Regions:
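Iron-sulfur-associated redox domains of electron-transfer enzymes in respiratory
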Residues: 1-114
């Protein structure tokens, strides 16, 4: 399975103002480009850690997870420890930055890593 998680920095970050995150997620769902799609308010918070624990509880089903949000380097720094804790193969993780993009720009950036 291939999944898309869009992290929106609580939904109040000015860097997401030009984008309709629902249109982004629905584009990938409607066009069958991913097997599942999720909008998470803040993956770097403690409930984000819990989200990863639940999602990766069935990690053998996951071929690729794309997280669209902040800088990929920051994502690896924030999620790396939980991936290690759960024994998740980090080569299946791809981070893509979509801050300060329009809806169309975000879709293109995500398509480039899928």
């Amino acid at each position: 399975m291939k999944g898309l998680i869009v992290c929106v920095c609580q939904g109040t970050c000015p860097s997401f103002q030009k984008m309709n995150v629902f249109e982004v997620v629905n584009y990938f769902r409607r066009n069958n480009k991913v097997d599942f799609a999720v909008i998470h308010p803040q993956l770097c918070a403690s409930d984000g850690d819990n989200f990863w624990r639940v999602l990766l509880g069935k990690q053998e089903l996951i071929d690729k997870i794309v997280v669209a949000g902040c800088a990929p380097e920051m994502q690896k720094k924030m999620f790396g420890w939980v991936f290690k804790e759960l024994g998740f193969d980090e080569s299946k993780f791809v981070g893509v930055e979509i801050r300060n993009m329009t809806t169309e720009e975000a879709i293109k950036a995500i398509e480039n890593v899928l």
